[in-house]
């Protein structure tokens, strides 16, 4: 289970979800869909050899931070208050986290850079060929199953 996403689910439980700036977008993929793609690539041939694919859930233009936060809220049966934090705010929080938790800080300046990168969406034309693979698990369903797993295993 992705413990980075877990924090988003945990905060959503309290009705509040701070996220990076509005302009960021990202592509997502369910691990089972990714595993199916890796298995489909095993019998290497000219069609797939020496190629770089960028798989995702098939959502054109990816997910905004706000859309992802609201979808996690729906998976949790909540409607969280989504707060966009600026890069400068996230950097201040990261420095404070470092002062308090030292080397165990969860939010680091490196992570802030990663989180605030504006475009983590797959490159147009880089998805795997439809004849080879296509995603089967919608992100909304995957997030709902993840929320249930967290509940069933007493993480939430």
Indicate where each model-derived feature is located.
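Flexible, glycine-rich beta-alpha linker
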Residues: 1-7, 16
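Residue-level signal for the nucleotide or nucleotide-sugar donor/cofactor binding architecture
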Residues: 3, 26-32, 63, 134-138
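A conserved catalytic-core signature of glycosyltransferases
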Residues: 7, 24, 110
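Short, hinge-like loop/turn segments at secondary-structure boundaries
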Residues: 7-11, 99-102
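A conserved pocket-lining segment of Rossmann-fold NAD(P)-dependent short-chain dehydrogenase/reductase
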Residues: 10-29, 33, 37-41, 45, ...
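Mid/C-terminal beta-alpha module of Rossmann-like enzyme folds, strongest
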Residues: 44-107, 137-156
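Residue-level preference for well-ordered alpha-helical positions
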Residues: 73, 128-130
């Amino acid at each position: 289970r992705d413990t980075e996403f877990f924090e988003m689910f945990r905060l959503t439980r309290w009705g509040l979800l701070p996220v990076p700036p509005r302009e960021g977008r990202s592509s997502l993929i369910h691990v089972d869909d990714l595993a199916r793609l890796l298995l489909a690539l095993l019998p290497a041939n000219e069609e797939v050899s020496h190629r770089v694919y960028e798989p995702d859930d098939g959502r054109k233009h990816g997910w905004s931070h706000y859309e992802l936060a609201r979808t996690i809220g729906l998976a949790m049966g909540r409607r969280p208050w989504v707060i966009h934090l600026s890069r400068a705010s996230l950097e201040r929080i990261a420095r404070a986290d470092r002062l308090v938790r030292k080397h165990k800080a969860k939010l680091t300046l490196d992570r802030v850079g990663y989180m605030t990168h504006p475009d983590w969406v797959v490159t147009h034309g880089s998805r795997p060929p439809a004849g080879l693979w296509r995603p089967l698990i919608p992100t909304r369903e995957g997030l709902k199953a993840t929320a249930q797993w967290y509940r069933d295993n007493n993480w939430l």
